[in-house]
Every structure is written in structure tokens, then in C-alpha cells.
């Protein structure tokens, strides 16, 4: 293990934890579960994971690692009791991550512990994915164990307006930057080859602006930037039970778009000269788009956009140049059921924000929060368009968004440099 990685292990795990890992001996297939405030669900999730790993015993010794990301309920005690019921043949380790505890440190601790155990294959899982099934673990591990992939991403079936932050910003921008057409940049689970973990950690494990909430984004970006062999696996519907109260939209943007922008700076040599995009091999059924149970109301979204145009204009003027603003002004005249914020304009807005973030024109938290009304405007426009589109043609809307971001990249690169 490189000296830098060893230092991080010491920073993340106490000596007793390192000793326990050393005594565990080599483990070939590791499942790492990061958890926060899931006392009511975590045992079911962990039992599913352990049961799935038992079926991989032919691939070598298996084990489960659990790291807490700062629970405020009884989760640590529940996890500790579960881990103590393990056996030498299928060990369970509860990693006591040194404070400050958060999701990012928990994920990195799991990766480093898996590396120390000599894992050939790992699966990372967010315990918020309470709908996890045994076949999910198999699907994520098999391409790695067969040496067909270095990094395995999930893909899900979803409703039209589900995951709009991913479909309208995170995935299109990632595709344009790194050239891979992936559905999820932070899908809550992933499969990894043990051989790639060390180099990725060595290059980017130091605490950066992607922490504490962008560790999944960092991992996916590291895979894309290193030209790792990628595979997507269709897992069906994504069922999530969040642990604890959920933040407001502006905070969500700070925690997701912020890390994505920060990683653009860290990995700029990997994307500045890259053009075009290509599909990633996908296993399993097609990821169908299902009808929404009820149509989302766009009136409040459009009202938020209009208020942003009125109240945040002095801030936006420091982020977006006049040509972009001039295209936004007329949108205030549109009724909610006729609202339009076309993908090319939206891609230009995101590009302007990325450049302003990179140049530190404003405090970054303040800048990202100013994106919220614009994002709501884009979601409203997406919903209005989707209502007028047959269900089987919804993927064409997603593709139109993706291509708009690809077309915007040349302009982004010119200003970034």
C-alpha cells in the first residue's frame, strides 16, 4: 500500500480496527455497506447482502464490511450486534470510522479496508437502498469476477419525472465531459475490481470539495477519467428509504452539483480534449420509462423561476454573461403550462455556472444556491414537454438533453481554458 494510502487508513480507522482487519486475513469478495440513521431497516439490508455473498463462496472467501456515516439513532448498536453474529468463514466487520463521520469518509474507509483485505472484487452499497435484492449483488459482482469490467454501474427503470436532477443535469454533463453514456452517476451501489481501487484512491482520496457528499460522484468520475472498463446492469426499480430528514433543493444542489463542478477541475486533463460519446455495455432488461402516478405541478416551479429572475438578477449577472441572460428574460412572460427552457439554453446556463465556479467569482455555496430557481424552471419545462409526449418517446427527450450538453462542450472548453 502506498504511503499516502496508509496515512489515510490511520486517519480513518483506529488501531484496533486495523488490527481486526489484519487478523481477518485475505477476503476475496467484499461487500461494503455505508449506513446512516437506518436502525429500522439495516438488518434486512445486511441479511440480504450476506445471503447473496454466500452464493459467491466458490469465488473465494467472502465478507461484509459496514461503515457508519454519522448516525444519530440506534444504527451503530444494531450494526455492531449484527456484525458480532458473523462466522470465521463469512466474517462481518463494523468499521469504526474516526470523526468527523460522514458519508464520504465511510465510503473511503470501506474502499481502503477492502484493499487492505486483498479483495479481488467489491460491491459498495448505500443502506438507503432498502429495496436491494440478492440478484442486485450478483449483477454487480459477476462482470468483475469474470474479469469483464473494472467498474459496474446500476441502471434503473423509472417514472417520467423521477430523478430529474440526474436526467437533466448530472448525467448529461457527465456524458459530455467524459464521453460515456451512463444513466446513473450516483446510483447508490457499484461493483469494483480490487485492482483499480488503489490507483483511484492514491490519485484522489485526499479530502476535497467533493466531500462529504460527493464520494459516489468522485468514484464514478475516477472510473471515467481512468478509462476503466465499464458495464451497466439493469436492476429494476430503485426503492430508497432516506435516513433522517431531507435537505431543501438548494442544499441538494450544493451537495451534488458542487462536487461535480469541483471534480471537473481535478480531472480536467481527462475531459478537455475528449469529444463525442459512446454507449456503455449494458446487461439485463431494457430500462423502461413508466408513467408518473400523478403529474407534478409546474406552477410553483415557474413562480420560483420568475422570483429568481427578479430577486437574484444581481447574482446571476456575476455568473452568466449578457447573451445568456437575454435569452432568459423573455421566459418570465410564459404561462406555467406553456413554459419553455430549451435544452440548449439550459446547457449554456449550466456551462456558465461551471465556469463561474471554476473561476471562484462568488462564494461557491452562494453560487450553487443561485442555480435552484433556474433548475426548477428547467424541470417545469421538461414536465410540460413530457406531458405532450407519448410515453414510448420520452427517451427521445432525455437524448435531446444529452446532445445539447455535448453540443455545448466546445463553448465550455473555450472558456474554461
Sequence positions of predicted segments:
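Conserved donor-nucleotide/metal-binding helix-loop-beta segment in metal-dependent transferases, i.e.
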Residues: 132-155
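Terminal low-complexity segments of carbohydrate-biosynthetic enzymes
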Residues: 2-3, 257-417
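Short beta-strand-to-loop acidic/aromatic patch adjacent to the donor-nucleotide binding site
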Residues: 119-130
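N-proximal low-complexity "stem/linker" segments adjacent to membrane-targeting elements
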Residues: 1-51, 410, 417
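Conserved donor nucleotide-binding strand/loop of the catalytic core
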Residues: 65, 76-105, 109, 113-116
Amino acid at each position: 500500500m502506498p504511503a499516502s494510502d496508509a496515512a489515510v487508513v490511520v486517519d480513518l480507522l483506529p488501531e484496533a480496527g486495523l488490527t481486526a482487519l489484519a487478523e481477518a486475513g485475505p477476503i476475496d469478495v467484499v461487500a461494503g455497506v455505508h449506513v446512516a440513521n437506518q436502525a429500522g431497516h439495516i438488518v434486512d439490508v445486511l441479511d440480504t447482502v450476506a445471503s447473496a455473498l454466500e452464493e459467491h463462496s466458490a469465488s473465494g472467501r467472502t465478507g461484509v464490511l459496514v461503515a457508519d456515516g454519522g448516525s444519530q439513532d440506534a444504527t451503530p448498536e444494531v450494526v455492531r450486534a449484527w456484525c458480532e453474529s458473523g462466522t470465521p468463514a463469512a466474517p462481518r466487520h463494523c468499521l469504526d470510522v474516526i470523526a468527523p463521520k460522514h458519508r464520504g469518509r465511510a465510503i473511503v474507509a470501506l474502499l481502503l479496508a477492502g484493499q487492505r483485505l486483498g479483495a479481488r472484487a467489491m460491491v459498495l452499497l448505500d443502506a438507503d437502498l432498502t429495496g436491494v435484492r440478492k440478484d442486485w449483488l450478483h449483477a454487480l459482482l459477476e462482470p468483475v469476477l469474470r474479469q469483464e469490467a473494472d467498474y459496474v454501474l446500476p441502471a434503473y427503470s423509472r417514472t417520467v419525472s423521477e430523478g430529474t436532477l440526474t436526467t437533466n443535469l448530472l448525467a448529461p454533463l457527465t456524458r459530455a465531459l467524459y464521453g460515456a453514456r451512463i444513466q446513473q452517476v450516483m446510483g447508490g451501489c457499484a461493483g469494483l475490481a480490487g485492482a483499480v481501487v488503489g490507483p483511484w484512491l492514491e490519485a484522489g482520496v485526499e479530502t476535497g470539495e467533493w466531500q462529504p457528499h460527493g464520494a459516489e460522484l468522485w468514484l464514478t468520475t475516477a472510473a471515467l477519467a481512468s478509462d476503466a472498463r465499464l458495464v451497466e446492469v439493469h436492476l429494476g426499480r430503485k426503492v430508497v428509504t432516506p435516513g433522517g430528514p431531507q435537505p431543501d433543493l438548494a442544499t441538494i444542489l450544493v451537495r451534488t452539483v458542487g462536487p461535480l463542478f469541483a471534480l471537473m477541475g481535478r480531472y480536467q486533463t481527462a475531459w478537455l480534449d475528449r469529444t463525442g460519446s459512446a454507449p456503455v455495455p449494458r446487461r439485463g432488461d431494457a430500462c423502461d420509462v413508466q408513467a408518473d402516478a400523478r403529474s407534478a405541478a409546474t406552477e410553483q416551479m415557474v413562480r420560483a423561476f420568475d422570483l429568481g429572475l427578479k430577486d437574484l438578477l444581481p447574482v446571476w449577472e456575476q455568473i452568466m454573461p449578457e447573451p445568456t441572460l437575454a435569452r432568459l428574460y423573455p421566459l418570465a412572460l410564459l404561462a406555467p403550462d406553456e413554459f419553455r427552457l430549451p435544452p440548449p439554453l439550459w446547457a449554456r446556463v449550466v456551462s456558465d455556472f461551471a465556469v463561474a465556479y471554476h473561476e471562484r467569482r462568488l462564494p461557491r455555496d452562494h453560487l450553487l444556491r443561485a442555480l435552484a430557481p433556474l433548475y426548477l424552471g428547467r424541470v417545469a419545462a421538461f414536465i410540460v414537454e413530457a406531458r405532450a409526449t407519448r410515453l414510448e418517446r420520452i427517451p427521445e427527450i432525455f437524448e435531446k438533453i444529452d446532445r445539447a450538453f455535448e453540443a455545448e462542450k466546445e463553448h465550455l472548453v473555450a472558456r474554461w481554458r
